[in-house]
Design a protein with these regions (language model features):
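Hydrophobic transmembrane alpha-helices and immediately adjacent juxtamembrane helices
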Residues: 1-258
Length: 258
């Protein structure tokens, strides 16, 4: 509880770091802020061509099926990979002044989250332009799904950022892990093609349920399965608590290691 109060007291610092990251992310580039939309759109085009044209995926409106899963996945993977280096990238700040170190991974994950929210504008534009339709009752559950994903991503980012201070290679390893994790999550394919004997393993992955919930709302236009959402939320809270525990244990010697 004391940690939450302290973080609340430093909320302005979190907002400032989020603004700084968003402004500095594409500083100096010609297209600047537009890269927020160009990167996921380019990935969407590549995956759509590969899976719907070359590999003959027969999913109806595959571009939409993929897009509503790809944007949340990019948020999650970016939170881990960018979050892993967050403490190291702010080492001067860590050495000079006191503040709750947890502020740093929180600000980086929040910055990635804001990027995802902006990309959702494009998702809704695609849905409207293509006439796919929207179930407004189902859309009301989107904030809950987003919060569940944010909690899980933050927990993982806390662990990654703290451990990376002591083991710098983790930052590079996580890039490989994120790529493998994506293919173990039904982002570019349907869970229905997974052999039944492997389904229990897939269902242990919180991102499987989170991606399913996004698809149920935005692609199938239905209210998501409450059981799946609760399972993902439970795992998300577990990793958040565990991540905070690991972070608090390791943060004591950040300054010396940096």
């Amino acid at each position: 509880m004391s940690t939450i109060k302290e973080l609340y007291a430093y909320r302005q610092m979190i907002f400032s770091l989020v603004k700084k990251d968003l402004r500095g992310r594409y500083k100096g580039s010609v297209l600047g802020f537009l890269w927020t939309f160009i990167n996921p759109l380019f990935q969407l085009i590549v995956y759509t061509i590969v899976f719907s044209k070359i590999l003959r995926n027969d999913v109806d409106r595959y571009y939409l099926y993929l897009f509503v899963a790809l944007i949340p996945w990019i948020f999650f993977s970016s939170s881990i990979t960018v979050g892993a280096a967050s403490i190291i990238s702010q080492k001067d700040l860590v050495k000079k002044i006191y503040f709750p170190r947890m502020v740093i991974p929180i600000s980086y994950v929040t910055s990635c989250f804001v990027n995802m929210l902006l990309c959702f504008i494009v998702i809704f534009a695609v849905i409207i332009v293509t006439g796919a339709g929207i179930n407004f009752v189902a859309v009301l559950t989107l904030p809950i799904i987003m919060i569940v994903e944010y909690i899980f991503a933050l927990g993982m980012a806390m662990i990654a950022s703290a451990v990376t201070v002591y083991f710098r290679d983790l930052e590079h390893i996580l890039g490989i892990v994120a790529m493998a994790w994506m293919y173990l999550t039904p982002v570019v394919y349907s869970k229905s093609i997974v052999p039944e004997k492997y389904l229990p393993l897939f269902n242990l992955n919180p991102m499987t349920h989170i991606i399913d919930c996004y698809r149920t709302v935005l692609y199938e236009k239905q209210v998501p399965d409450l059981t799946a959402l609760l399972w993902a939320a439970g795992l998300g809270v577990f990793f958040l608590v565990f991540g905070a525990f690991v972070f608090n244990k390791l943060q004591r010697h950040f300054a010396e290691e940096l």
